[in-house]
Swiss-Prot record:
Listed Basic residues bias regions: 330-349
In-chain residues carrying the UniProt-annotated modification Phosphoserine: S316, S321
Pfam families named in the record: FAM199X (PF15814)
Alphabetical UniProt keywords: Phosphoprotein
Entry protein name: Protein FAM199X
Disordered: annotated segments: 288-358
Family the UniProt entry places it in: Belongs to the FAM199 family.
UniProt feature, compositional bias: Low complexity: 288-312
Length: 388
């Protein structure tokens, strides 16, 4: 009993560099069978062993060191495996290591009982590290991932196996016409606003655009000189977006029969013109020489009358245009003369004001007196003979 107690206490001490890989059971002699001793654990059943683990902050160890996983699989016999049999999860150096066997019962086969170092480390790793959002690349030298053996799940069950091997799927482009405004992201809202702006400006008239602006922002002030309207993202809500979509749908339904009628009218005009041309050519080919001559004569007469009518109309149009041009020239001439008269009057008025200002400032005409003289000419009754 004393030997077993001393062996137990010796394995509960701190790890030393000379003993980097302690076994989980009591010391055995060479050649002893593991199943013969009670309370011993056969390591070949698992093919892995946690060599050392720090009690320091795992997140700090993640950033300062790289995790290395090595494995040789669980199918290798215990006699063929050497030191490569054991999977090691090394977190930095071997300094300041604590024994994995603290508070561990040797009669239990639970690798990581509650409260042990390994359970603390595994829970700390799963707490400090978010595997779903990490860009951490797992390096597994010597392990066959395709064979189905998951060393990581054997060592620490709380960590998901190979989290970064499954590639993240990109989000598919959603149909924005079926989404509510609150269900869209900021980028989707901007994209949908640009789509609505292009659709409304290209397919609708000015009245419809004003109606949509009033739906989006009832208090918007639009002047006749505005050429664009900026839509703020915070002005739109789910209800307003629903009203805009319904308005656009109703407008497209109203415009559809008009477009179809216009297309049908164009097609019917083209078809009737083609039929009339074909019938005219057929009748002209089956007509006799006399009828063709008479038709040609009548066509010549009609063309002559049409040309004379066109000439008279052109002459009357030219007369009208000449009289209109003459009236325009007269009005321009009168307006020019009026402007010249106004300019001369303004110039004379400014000159008189300037002269009066100069006289007042000089003081030379303060005692000025204006005298009015009237000269009367006497009529000479007698004629003067200039020859004398």
């Amino acid at each position: 009993m004393s030997d077993e107690a001393s062996a137990t206490t010796s394995y509960e001490k701190f790890l030393t560099p000379e003993e980097p890989f302690p076994f989980l059971g009591a010391p055995r002699g060479v050649g002893t069978c593991p199943s013969e001793e009670p309370g011993c654990l056969d390591i070949s059943d698992f093919g892995c062993q946690l060599s050392s683990c720090h009690r320091t902050d795992p997140l700090h160890r993640f950033h300062t060191n790289r995790w290395n996983l090595t494995s040789c699989g669980t199918s290798v016999a215990s006699s063929e495996c050497s030191e490569e049999l054991f999977s090691s999860v090394s977190v930095g150096d071997q300094d300041d290591c604590y024994s994995l066997l603290d508070d561990q019962d040797f009669t239990s086969f639970d690798l990581f009982p509650e409260g042990s170092v390994c359970s603390d480390v595994s829970s700390s790793i799963s707490t400090y590290w978010d595997w779903s959002d990490s860009e951490f690349e797992w390096q597994l030298p010597g392990s066959d991932i395709a064979s189905g053996s998951d060393v990581l799940s054997d060592v620490i069950p709380s960590i998901p196996s190979s989290p970064c091997l499954v590639s993240k799927k990109k989000n598919k482009h959603r149909n924005l016409d079926e989404l509510a405004w609150s269900a869209m992201t900021n980028d989707e809202q901007v994209e949908y606003i640009e789509y609505l702006s292009r659709k409304v400006s290209t397919e609708m008239g000015l009245r419809e655009q004003l109606d949509i602006i009033k739906i989006i922002d009832p208090s918007a002030q639009i002047s006749p000189t505005d050429s664009e309207f900026i839509i703020e993202l915070n002005c739109l809500t789910d209800e307003k977006l629903k009203q805009v979509r319904n308005y656009i749908k109703e407008h497209s339904l109203r415009q559809r029969p008009t477009r179809e009628a216009w297309k049908r009218s164009n097609f019917s005009c083209a078809s009737t013109s083609g039929v009339s041309g074909a019938s005219a050519s057929a009748s002209s080919s089956s007509a006799s020489m006399v009828s063709s001559a008479s038709s040609s004569g009548s066509s010549v007469g009609n063309s002559a009358s049409n040309s004379s009518a066109n000439m008279s109309r052109a002459h009357s149009d030219s007369n009208l245009s000449a009289s209109a041009a003459e009236r325009i020239r007269d009005s321009k001439k009168r307006s020019k003369q009026r402007k010249l008269q106004q300019k001369a009057f303004r110039k004379r008025q400014l000159k008189e004001q300037r002269q009066a200002r100069k006289e007042r400032l000089s003081g030379l005409f303060l005692n000025e007196e204006v005298l009015s003289l009237k000269v009367t000419e006497e009529d000479h009754e007698a004629d003067v003979d200039v020859l004398m």
